[in-house]
Amino acid sequence: MSTEHKQSLSAVTLAAIGVVYGDIGTSPLYTLRECFSGHYGFDVRPDVVFGFLSLIFWMLILVVSVKYLTYVMRADNAGEGGILTLMSLAGRNTSSRATSILVVLGLIGGSFFYGEVVITPAISVMSAIEGLEIAAPALDPYIVPCSIAVLTLLFVIQKHGTGSVGKLFAPVMLVWFLTLALLGLRSIIANPEVLAALNPKWAISFFVEYKSVSFFALGAVVLAITGVEALYADMGHFGKFPIRLAWFTVVLPSLVLNYFGQGALLLKNPEAIKNPFFLLAPDWALIPLLILATLATVIASQAVISGVFSLTRQAVRLGYLPPMRIIHTSEMESGQIYIPVINWTLYLAVVLVIIGFERSSNLAAAYGIAVTGTMVITSILFCTVAWKNWHWNRFLVAFLLMVLLIIDIPMFSANVLKLFSGGWLPLSLGLVMFIIMTTWKSERFSLLRRMHEHSNSLEAMIASLEKSPPVRVPGTAVYMSRAMNVIPFALLHNLKHNKVLHERVVLLTMRTDDVPYVHNVERVTIEQLSPTFWRVVARYGWRETPNVAEIFHRCGLEGLSCQMMETSFFMSHESLILTKRPWHLFLRGKLFIALSRNALRAPDQFEIPPNRVIELGTQVEI
């Protein structure tokens, strides 16, 4: 291996530590404390401590190391991962009915992420700042205001991008993980018998001894693996090997040492359960640890915010959310984006959650149901990909699915039992996003079908216009067309009302392919339909933002020269009229109209100069 390659691998692995593992890396702040919370009624006794530690350790091994790093990360689309990517892969070789079911599952998983993303910044930052209780108990009333202040600053700087400060994320998180390891190791050395919990018999004995109560406790243990989806979702940014390398060399050892260090502390001093993480540190280190923990939770929150921006862009490009303003905050990195409406909606939700729940321990009950629900869906989608796309033996796939669900379903069920103590929050938020995504997709499809169902043949119309041409005016006209073989509404209305046509007409169709990126060579396809009509199809991946200036540049290279300031862009603007429907479809129609009115207009989507755009209105019944 060359020196340059080693340096590159080290840099990417370090970057992965800073971004991918922020959420799961801050779980030691609250996980073990919540295992012994009053909800479950466990006393801090050695057999219970060993049981919880064994469960946490084997959860990290089976769910993170085996399920995600070994199996799920094999399913990639040109290197990209994530729940919507997995949904897309799973539906490629299935029947239309099965595909519909898989799409619904994928959208539910994506919706769960939106529910989870509201909780992660709140619980992470609050749990860090709650260290004030240990360092200075008199500051307890300021935990909520301080948490809101920290997160306000984080959301405000989003519009400026995180490129400059982002370089500090990896070193800070590396220091964080090393600190986790050192704090835990210090406590383990003082009480090494805690390492007996590595034996899975303690987890089994825990279930045998405490029976039904231990099942409820799974709802707390699962806090140790929140953020596991980030490993798969961020695969496209860092690659599989650096993410795996970071986990096995730095993250996993640090987490295990810290959890077991907290356990060793509890064996020695059961009173430390009020905050075992911060009580691991000597008195002189409390303030530095509090600052480091706050920085780590802010970085974890930033990773989640960036993740929701990426998921939203993917959903918009795949047609599951309405177009919205997406701002690129870096000229070098296409993945660094900012979506104002998502940013401030998320900020408002996070602040309301902090004010409403007040303590991270209250919020812990809400955390987990979205994570485990997504895990169940991921298992089903992955096994579908293994069976249909990779042609694995169906009995092997069935066995694998059974094993995965034996782990996933009990954890999900245990969290469902927390529905009325906080679990309703991510479910409610997820339900709202699911309704929005399914409404936009289905109503948009119905609208386009209604608009084109009475449309004449494009070829026949062009032949008619060439045979009996209307008055021609100099210049080029571009008509945006959603479908390749359909007459654009704007063209029909221009002929109907103005009775003129430009000397050169370009029918431009934007296509989103089921890949993250499309090579520039394949970006544009040009077809001359007649002496004065051209069809241009521009292809983009769901990680890319369409740009008309780039399309014109590619057209020029292909022999079709178009100058932006000498071209008129004709677009149709639909005024939607709601017809009589059943009450539930009526409400969905109202939601669709509201989403349409607030969607980003096409000229802004494609960065077309406003003074080159002509919009022609049309009324459409839906």
From Swiss-Prot:
Keywords: Cell inner membrane, Cell membrane, Ion transport, Membrane, Potassium, Potassium transport, Symport, Transmembrane, Transmembrane helix, Transport. It catalyses: K(+)(in) + H(+)(in) = K(+)(out) + H(+)(out). It is a multi-pass membrane protein. The keyword Glycoprotein does not apply. Its main location: membrane. NCBIfam families: kup, PRK10745.1. Responsible for the low-affinity transport of potassium into the cell. Likely operates as a K(+):H(+) symporter. This is Low affinity potassium transport system protein Kup. The gene is kup.
